[in-house]
């Protein structure tokens, strides 16, 4: 399978990855790099647009190469707020040829601004420091629900710092970040009456810090990785439109780890654990609670089989106290060198903390306590293959059951529109196919389509499902015209269900409609380390809305410069 790489042409990058070695993409100037190699600390830019909107069942992709499969045994950092987005299609370059510093800046209509800077400093052979800053935002007029213009503004600024040191037996990692989101709410109309709120503005502050250790000596009888950290989410202007109760502040002490031992060269057993202690201010609708998850597992990695057999045992205190159990099973059979038949049966708990709600929509608000979402089963059956060099395809289908699934719609309250969350049990059948092709560093293309069938037991099912997709289609292509010049083409389509309400002898559709976003772009390196880039999004000039009900920009352009050093 050939890995893909997004170019630095994209208008908005994933802000939490801004500190990584951002100059990896510039290694493409070396024409000898026509092979795919594995790279550490690569920088994967993400498009923060329509692709961020849906939180859907994830279909995991098994490897097709004849080698041991990795099941993400390394810990994830305690992350700041991110959008859900398409997986980056990137080509992996040799890191020792890449620069360690990177700066990019772009500007466009709707007041779009995109600034990223980062540096990776290898202080010594054992010490590494990563620094990153970013600014993403816009300030322009968008179409209001009532077909009027709404003066919208949204700016997100982030700074991150991470440090690692290799001791003889273990590696120490510590780091943290601070993020600020400043924006305004959409009023119910341009001439709305006096509101109980002092202003339409809002300011979210997110902070995090983590420290962790992981083993690096394979001769130890047990391998391990451990991490603990603190996450903070603060809201400056309380959301008091519902019974004068505000969301307040949230603090989370997050601890996780994985300890495992090898039975032989092909087998190992281990246990992962994760604990979250959540604390809320006294004026919050949420109450303090603790969530603990244990994940014992057995793994087999042979020439033909990759098997993981485990279980998720989750306990939670507070109003939703109790124990839940779900499977953690993966079976993948490799035959004829590059064909894989796989079956996954997964599950587990997702905390509906402020960060997850904010990932749905920064315009969110609470009118009730939000229990955690639990997935008793998410089963996927698929077939993946690479019949010829450079071509890869994946056909899959699955079924997902979830308790307290998150749904959302737009609510007019206190003179402004907020994203309102609903919860209920949901059942989702899904199926689709994915095709990828790559030729050296000259051409990459990816096409993926997925059908979804959502069901709930709620009598207002249409209201709950109006923002969920029926069908998703994503296409992306990248081509090198000649050395230094690359062009890009992308398309995203999301089909949603209708939400029709009968009004006397007539009916009215309150659905959000479909998403159709065609984008093009190009980048040109005219000096050794200096490039110019540009992109046009929503080329068809469609009016569509994000899952949380707020309008997206129509045809928008962004251009700028990037420098590697």
Enumerate the language-model features and the residues they cover.
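N-terminal periplasmic/intermembrane-space "pro-region" immediately following the signal or transit peptide
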Residues: 26-93
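Short sequence motifs at beta-strands and strand-loop junctions characteristic
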Residues: 97, 107-111, 149-155, 199-207, ...
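Exposed, low-structure sequence patches enriched in small/polar residues
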Residues: 98, 103, 306, 314, ...
């Amino acid at each position: 399978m050939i890995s893909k790489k997004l170019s630095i042409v994209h208008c908005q990058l994933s802000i939490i990855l801004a500190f990584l070695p951002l100059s990896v993409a510039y290694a493409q100037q070396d024409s000898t790099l026509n092979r795919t190699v594995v790279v550490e600390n690569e920088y994967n830019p993400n498009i923060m647009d329509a692709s961020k909107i849906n939180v859907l069942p994830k279909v995991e992709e098994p490897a097709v190469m004849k080698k041991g499969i990795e099941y993400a045994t390394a810990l994830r950092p305690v992350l700041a707020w991110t959008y859900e987005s398409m997986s980056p299609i990137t080509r992996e370059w040799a890191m020792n040829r890449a620069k360690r510093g990177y700066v990019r800046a772009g500007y466009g209509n709707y007041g779009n601004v995109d600034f990223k800077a980062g540096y990776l400093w290898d202080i010594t052979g054992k010490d590494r420091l990563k620094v990153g800053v970013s600014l993403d935002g816009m300030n322009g007029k968008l179409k209001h629900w009532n077909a009027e213009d709404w003066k919208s503004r949204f700016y997100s600024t982030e700074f991150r710092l991470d440090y690692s040191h290799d001791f003889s037996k273990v590696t120490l990692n510590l780091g943290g970040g601070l993020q600020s989101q400043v924006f305004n709410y959409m009023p119910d109309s341009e001439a709305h009456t006096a509101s109980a709120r002092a202003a339409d503005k809002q300011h979210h502050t997110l902070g995090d810090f983590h420290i962790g250790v992981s083993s690096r000596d394979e001769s130890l009888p047990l391998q391990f990785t451990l991490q603990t950290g603190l996450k903070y989410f603060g809201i400056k202007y309380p959301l008091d439109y519902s019974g004068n109760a505000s969301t307040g502040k949230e603090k989370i002490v997050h601890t996780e780890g994985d300890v495992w031992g090898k039975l032989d060269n092909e087998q190992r057993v281990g246990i992962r654990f994760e604990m979250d202690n959540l604390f809320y201010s006294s004026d919050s609708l949420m109450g303090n609670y603790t969530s603990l998850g244990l994940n014992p597992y057995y793994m087999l990695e042979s020439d033909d089989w990759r098997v993981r057999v485990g279980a998720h045992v989750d306990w939670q205190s507070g109003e939703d106290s109790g124990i839940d159990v779900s499977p953690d099973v993966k079976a993948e059979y490799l035959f004829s060198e590059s064909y894989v038949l796989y079956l996954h049966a997964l599950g587990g708990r997702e905390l509906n903390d402020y960060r997850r709600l904010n990932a749905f929509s920064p315009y969110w608000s609470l009118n009730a306590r939000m229990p955690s979402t639990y997935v008793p089963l998410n089963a996927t059956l698929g077939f993946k293959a690479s019949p010829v060099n450079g071509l890869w395809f994946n056909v899959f289908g699955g079924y997902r059951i979830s308790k307290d699934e998150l749904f959302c719609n737009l609510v007019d309250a206190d003179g402004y529109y907020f994203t309102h969350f609903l919860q209920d049990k949901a059942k989702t059948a899904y199926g689709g196919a994915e095709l990828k092709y790559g030729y050296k560093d000259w051409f990459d293309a990816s096409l993926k389509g997925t059908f979804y069938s959502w069901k709930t037991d709620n009598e207002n099912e249409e209201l709950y499902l109006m923002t969920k997709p029926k069908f998703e289609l994503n296409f992306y292509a990248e081509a090198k015209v000649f050395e230094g010049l690359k062009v890009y083409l992308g398309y995203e389509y999301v089909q949603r269900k209708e939400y029709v309400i009968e009004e006397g002898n007539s009916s009215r559709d309150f659905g959000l409609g479909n998403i159709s976003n065609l984008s093009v772009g190009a980048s040109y390196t005219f000096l050794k380390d200096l490039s110019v880039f540009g992109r046009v999004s929503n080329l068809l000039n469609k009016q569509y809305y994000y899952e949380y009900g707020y309008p997206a920009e129509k045809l928008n352009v962004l251009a700028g410069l990037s420098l590697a050093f």
